[in-house]
């Protein structure tokens, strides 16, 4: 018997999706494989999803896989790589607490006296629709169905039918929906799930309906006893597949909650299963109020992926009397506004306008090329493993793909992919990319990524073993097939080739020879292909660093694999808990090595990127920029934040930071240096076109202040528009800011404003400013930083003096557009 020991790396524990993936990995082996949770002293058949879920395994639990059988050595090698490298990817990223924390109710809403119910935010957003109550169905009618001689046959038929339905949905869905449906399919195909129903029928003589319900209750009870909220919330998945089985077996007992949404609807229910959610017309699902759903339920994951706002914490009996009435579900402030009046509806119309502006701006920002504040260009690209990931990466702002892990095509299968399959996969991502560069890393297999059909013997230390470019000469036909596929696909886009684990010039010279042979073959075969291809290497073996100058004669670029390079530089196995604390790329030796690579390559006209985890670490972005790296490749969700941060950094300041870091004596000194490093704030003018509006159709004072404060949030002048608005209203409480002549000057000094601003809205029609000075047609809002000293008084005084001048006022009211107002103010005012 062989054993793999590990700590559970899953932040949410071993729930349905990772259990399904682990079961799939284990089921391909003939050996018996037992999963053990040592904290719980719980054992499970690793080829049963349900049994795995039942172990109650939480993050960082001590676990092991015991493997016994004819193929145990191969199984251990492959499963160890999966557990240590890929298992964590089977878990889902959950929203942060900040994302689920309701904003304080803005004064521009509370002053309108809305009829509100308060709840808890589960999925952020705002939805407008009719409140519709979904009643829960009792299962008593199924439980009461007497046992029948046909029950066993009916069970098999129902299981097969449900599996067929789930498979059909899998073919039609993608993203989170597909992942959750796969987990459900795994559960109903699980021997333990069906086996327990059969045992209840044979040993306890229960009818099929009662047995399905009893099995559901037993599994749910076990999950409900878990210490993990995430595992407790998997109860909904068990209930879901059990209820689907009941409905398939007795279709005549049609559930009352078969809901069709014919207009925008806010759905109110005790809970909603994933299959119920997927059956809804999402175009008309404005939001949901779910009394008992937890923050990590699969229904919530689907809702977030579909941008459906959700609240909880509202008792159904408190909402039932409002059924059929219009409402606004505000899952930003955590409230339900019942039967909103015109003023409240107007507030949410303004909120939607601001949300649309923000979404448009974010899309534009993501599409922009990445530059530092002083216009230093750096490519921000994505790491992906399949062509399906490419569109999402580009939507996040990826300027290309810095690492396409082609080895994913070779894994978890019985034979290697043929040339056509590879060509189609590579072509797909290139077509999605347009002219964006795609760097295909040739197959990084062998060693820690064992491929059974290659029959590479097990090694003591696979990370230092027979892998990547080292295996290519033995498997030259396999490598040539991949080269042909990439060269064919390269004729459809900007393809580049990268070779992993290179340590000598001989290896790259051999590879270049194989590329030429592949080109000759493709010409002979009459297949469309690229005549040349940009070639680079992964820099992950330290020996390469000392002969970068020689490699510059043979390749076009370098990409530093920081994960493996760190291991090899320090002789540290990052998966060994006794030495993993030594694994740290932010040390003087590592940074000096990066500096040497970049300097030497740049001197010879070659570019250098980084594609390990370090590339997406925002804390270390100033160092990477300062070291002169030309490209950062990372997981695509990190790209928007990295691009945004880069725009705040001055490359010269970062270069000095990197120089100082390379002179440090320890990692601790470098971390202290980073902590003390404060990027210089981008200076923005007090007056800017982005904050000036003409002919704004506001109904009241509240909308004007809401819009102007919210717009400052959209434009990045404040990260806290609600808090800034509160400061404006506090000033309004002291004395109204209507100054006469149809003008109001709301103002504040606030800690919440990053860039002091003057915002202007000329209104389409006057509004009541609740001031003795009459209605207002022009709003000039001053929001100045808390550290501005007496500057706010100077600005206010200048404006007030100018506004007394009739000609100045008339010019403001007569200006044709926002640019004309900006030009007038810049001419007349000095700050």
Swiss-Prot record:
One CC-aspect GO term: membrane
UniProt keyword annotations, A-Z: Cytoplasm, Kinase, Magnesium, Metal-binding, Phosphoprotein, Phosphotransferase system, Sugar transport, Transferase, Transport
Catalytic reaction list: L-histidyl-[protein] + phosphoenolpyruvate = N(pros)-phospho-L-histidyl-[protein] + pyruvate; D-fructose(out) + N(pros)-phospho-L-histidyl-[protein] = D-fructose 1-phosphate(in) + L-histidyl-[protein]
Modified residues (Phosphohistidine): 15, 298, 747
Leader peptide range in chain numbering: none
PROSITE patterns with a match to the protein in the record: PEP_ENZYMES_2, PTS_EIIA_TYPE_2, PTS_HPR_DOM
Name of the top EC class for this enzyme: transferase
HPr domain span: 1-90
Family: Belongs to the PEP-utilizing enzyme family.
PANTHER family the UniProt entry points to: MULTIPHOSPHORYL TRANSFER PROTEIN 1-RELATED (PTHR46244:SF4), PHOSPHOENOLPYRUVATE-PROTEIN PHOSPHOTRANSFERASE (PTHR46244)
NCBIfam families in the cross-refs: fruA (TIGR00848), PTS_I_fam (TIGR01417)
Primary role: Multifunctional protein that includes general (non sugar-specific) and sugar-specific components of the phosphoenolpyruvate-dependent sugar phosphotransferase system (sugar PTS). This major carbohydrate active transport system catalyzes the phosphorylation of incoming sugar substrates concomitantly with their translocation across the cell membrane. The enzyme II FryABC PTS system is involved in fructose transport.
Name this protein carries in UniProt: Multiphosphoryl transfer protein
UniProt source species: Shigella flexneri
Gene: fryA
């Amino acid at each position: 018997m062989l054993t793999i020991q590990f700590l559970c790396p899953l932040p949410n524990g071993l729930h349905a999706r990772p259990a399904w993936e682990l079961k799939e990995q284990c089921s391909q082996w003939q050996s018996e494989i037992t999963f053990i949770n040592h904290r719980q002293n719980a054992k499970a058949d690793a080829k049963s999803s349900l049994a795995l879920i039942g172990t109650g395994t939480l993050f960082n639990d001590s676990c092991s896989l015991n493997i016994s059988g004819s193929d145990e050595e191969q199984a251990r090698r492959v499963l160890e790589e999966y557990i240590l490298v890929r298992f964590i990817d089977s878990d889902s990223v959950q929203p942060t607490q900040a994302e689920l924390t309701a904003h304080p109710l803005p004064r521009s809403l509370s002053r309108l006296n809305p009829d509100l119910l308060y709840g808890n935010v589960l999925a952020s957003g705002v939805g407008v629709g009719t409140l519709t109550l979904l009643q829960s169905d009792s299962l008593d009618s199924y439980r009461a169905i007497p046992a029948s001689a046909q029950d066993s046959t009916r069970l098999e038929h129902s299981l097969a039918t449900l599996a067929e339905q789930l498979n059909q949905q899998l073919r039609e869905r993608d993203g989170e929906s597909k992942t959750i449906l796969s987990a459900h399919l795994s559960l109903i195909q699980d021997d333990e799930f069906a086996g327990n129903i059969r045992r209840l029928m044979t040993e306890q003589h229960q009818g099929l309906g009662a047995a399905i319900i009893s099995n559901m209750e037993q599994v749910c009870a076990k999950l409900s006893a878990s210490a993990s909220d995430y595992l407790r919330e998997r109860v909904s998945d068990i209930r879901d597949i059990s209820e689907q089985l009941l409905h398939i077996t007795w279709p005549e007992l049609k559930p009352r909650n078969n809901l069709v949404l014919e207009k925008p609807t806010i759905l109110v229910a005790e809970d909603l299963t994933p299959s119920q959610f997927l059956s809804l017309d999402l175009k008309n699902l404005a939001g949901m109020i779910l009394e008992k759903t937890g923050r990590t339920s699969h229904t919530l994951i689907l809702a977030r992926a579909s941008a459906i706002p959700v609240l909880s914490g509202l008792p159904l009996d408190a909402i039932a009397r409002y059924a059929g009435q219009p409402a606004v579900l505000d899952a930003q402030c955590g409230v339900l506004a019942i039967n909103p009046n015109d003023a409240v509806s107007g507030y949410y119309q303004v909120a939607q306008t601001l949300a649309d502006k923000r979404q448009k701006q974010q899309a534009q920002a993501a599409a922009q090329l990445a530059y530092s504040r002083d216009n230093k260009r750096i490519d921000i690209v994505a790491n992906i493993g399949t062509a399906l990931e490419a569109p999402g990466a580009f939507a996040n702002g990826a300027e290309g793909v810095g690492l396409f892990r082609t080895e994913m095509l070779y894994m978890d299968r019985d034979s290697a992919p043929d040339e056509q399959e590879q060509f189609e996969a590579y072509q797909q991502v290139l077509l999605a990319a347009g002219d964006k560069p795609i760097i295909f890393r040739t197959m990084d297999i062998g060693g820690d990524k064992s491929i059974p059909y290659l029959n590479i013997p097990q090694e003591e230390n696979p990370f230092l073993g027979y892998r990547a470019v080292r295996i290519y000469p033995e498997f030259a036909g396999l490598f040539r097939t991949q080269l042909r596929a990439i060269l064919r696909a390269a004729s459809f886009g900007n393809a580049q080739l990268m070779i992993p684990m290179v340590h000598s010039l001989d290896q790259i010279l051999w590879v270049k020879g194989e590329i030429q042979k592949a080109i000759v073959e493709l010409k002979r075969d009459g297949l469309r292909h690229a005549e040349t291809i940009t070639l680079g290497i992964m820099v992950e073996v330290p020996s390469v660093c000392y002969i970068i100058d020689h490699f510059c004669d043979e390749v076009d670029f370098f990409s530093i694999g920081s994960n493996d390079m760190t291991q090899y530089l320090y002789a540290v196995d990052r998966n060994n808990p006794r030495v993993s604390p030594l694994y740290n790329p932010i040390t003087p030796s590592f940074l000096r090595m990066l500096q040497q690579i970049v300097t030497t390559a740049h001197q010879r006209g070659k570019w250098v990127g980084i594609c390990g985890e370090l590339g997406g670490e925002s804390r270390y972005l100033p160092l990477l920029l300062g070291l002169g790296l030309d490209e950062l490749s990372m997981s695509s969700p990190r790209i928007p934040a990295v691009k945004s941060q880069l725009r705040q950094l001055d490359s010269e300041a970062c270069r000095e930071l990197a120089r100082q870091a390379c002179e440090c004596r320890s990692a601790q000194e470098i971390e202290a240096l980073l902590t003390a490093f404060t990027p210089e704030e981008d200076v923005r003018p007090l007056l800017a076109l982005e904050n000036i509006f003409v002919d704004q159709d506001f109904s009241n004072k509240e909308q004007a202040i809401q819009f102007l404060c919210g717009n400052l949030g959209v434009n990045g002048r404040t990260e806290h528009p609600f808090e800034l608005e509160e400061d404006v209203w506090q000033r309004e409480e002291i004395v109204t800011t209507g100054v006469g002549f149809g003008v109001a000057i709301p103002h504040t000094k606030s800690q919440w404003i990053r860039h002091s601003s003057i915002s202007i809205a000329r209104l389409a029609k006057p509004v009541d400013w609740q001031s003795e000075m009459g209605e207002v047609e022009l709003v000039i809002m001053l929001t100045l930083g808390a550290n501005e000293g007496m500057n706010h008084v100077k600005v206010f005084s200048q404006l007030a003096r100018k506004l007394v001048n009739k000609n100045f006022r008339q010019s403001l009211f007569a200006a044709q557009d926002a640019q004309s107002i900006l030009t007038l103010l810049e001419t007349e005012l000095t700050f």
